Amino acid sequence: MARRVTRAKKRERKNIVSGVAHIKSTFNNTIVTITDTKGNTISWSSAGQVGFKGSRKSTPFAAQMAAESAAREAMEHGLKEVEVMVKGPGAGREAAIRSLQAAGLEVNLIKDVTPIPHNGCRPPKRRRV
């Protein structure tokens, strides 16, 4: 019995002008996701995906490279302007925003959406080094 040749569905080029860049910056990594205004993902990248491993993922330079990679892919879909939503306390917050601007995207809005508990879960005990 012969196998059927299946072709991978080629990603169609959407023509999206404006979108939202979500930057999640933790102490260990930075993840940049670019979506349209409805929330559908156009492109994403992270410090680990760009090629950094271990403690180098948490550097501002790794965040810059991740944002640049995501922006380049999004601009292929016709993206021109973004609103930036930043979440988390990591080192790559500002570097990622600057990199999006340097890549050629127009940043309209920068908003901090870091979740803050209203006295929710008990935090882990303090480290003693």
Swiss-Prot record:
What the entry lists under Pfam families is as follows: Ribosomal_S11
> Is RNA-binding one of the keywords?
yes
Alphabetically ordered keywords of this record = Ribonucleoprotein, Ribosomal protein, RNA-binding, rRNA-binding
> Per the UniProt entry, what are the Gene Ontology biological process annotations, in alphabetical order?
translation
Can you supply one Gene Ontology CC term for this chain's record?
ribonucleoprotein complex
Q: Which GO terms describe its molecular function?
A: rRNA binding; structural constituent of ribosome
The highest taxon in the source lineage is Bacteria
Query: Gene3D superfamilies under this entry?
Result: Ribosomal protein S11
Query: Which InterPro entries does the entry link to?
Result: Ribosomal_uS11, Ribosomal_uS11_bac-type, Ribosomal_uS11_CS, Ribosomal_uS11_sf
Similarity annotation: Belongs to the universal ribosomal protein uS11 family.
Q: Which PANTHER family match?
A: 40S RIBOSOMAL PROTEIN S14/30S RIBOSOMAL PROTEIN S11 (PTHR11759)
Subunit comment: Part of the 30S ribosomal subunit. Interacts with proteins S7 and S18. Binds to IF-3.
The job of this chain, per UniProt, is described as: Located on the platform of the 30S subunit, it bridges several disparate RNA helices of the 16S rRNA. Forms part of the Shine-Dalgarno cleft in the 70S ribosome.
NCBIfam families per the record?
A: PRK05309.1, uS11_bact
> Could you tell me what this protein is called?
Small ribosomal subunit protein uS11
